[in-house]
Amino acid sequence: MVSASRRITAGEFQQCVDNGVAELVEIKIGYDGIVLAHSKNVPPMSLTNKQIYLALAGKIPNPAAPEQFIDNPYTSWNEIDDSLPKIKIGVMGPPPSSGTRDAFVSLLMEKGCEQIPTIAALKQAKRSQFDTLCQSIRSDGAYIETGENDNIIVQKLEMNPTDLGILGYNFLDQNRDKLQGSLLDGVAADYKSIAARQYEAARPLYLYVKKSHIPFIPGINEFLYDLTSEETWGEEGYLREKGLIPASQQERQEFRKDALLLKDFTL
C-alpha cells in the first residue's frame, strides 16, 4: 500500500504495469489543502495565483518585450504588485520529488501561468515550452528547498518571520498559535473552504493497494474496512482530529464500496 497527496498519473500507472503490477485499488481518503504559511508576528498576506507564479517562476515574460522570456528578476514582493509588502521574496518548500510540490505547481503555479497571455498562447502551439515555463521554479535562492518534512518548515518560519512556507493544511491547523495562512484570491484556508472546494489549492488524498498482495498479507481487508468506516474518515471520525478534511458523504460511500469490493483502478 502507498498513500499519495495526488492521484497517480497515467505514466506512473504504466510504470506499475511494466513492472508486473497491473491491478490496483484506489481509495480517495479525503481532502487537504496547500497553504502558503508565515509567522503570526507579521501582517497577513493576500496573494493571487498570478502573483505566486511571478514570484517563483524560473522565467517570466520580459515586461519590456512580453514575447521574450527572461530569468525572474523580482527580489521583493512589491516589485510584482505595489499592493504587496516591500519584503524580500523567500519561500520554503519541498523538492521536486514531493507530491506536495507537484500539487503546488498544478494548483497554483500553472493556474497563475495561464493568466499571462503570452504564455497562455503557447498551450496549444508549443506545449513543451508552455509546460516548462509554467512548472519550472526559480533556483536563485528565492525558493528554498527544505526537504519533505513539513515540521522543519514550521521551525524555520519561526526563525524567518517574513518568509513563506509551502505546507499541507493540517500543519497550519496544528500550528495556528505560531503561523497564519496567506489568503488565496481572497479565500482563507480553513475546514469549510477546503471541504466546499472554495479554496483553490484544495487537493484530494489517496491510498493505493496492490491487489496481488491481499491474499498473502493478513489484515489488509480488515484495514480497508476500518479505514473506510465513518468512525475513521467520517465527519466525526478520528482522522479529522489529525487534520483530514472528510470527503462528501457520497464520495465516502462510493470509495468504501470500491475498497470492500477491491474494484480495479482505471484512469
Residue map of PLM features:
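Flexible loop/hinge segments at secondary-structure junctions
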Residues: M1-L267
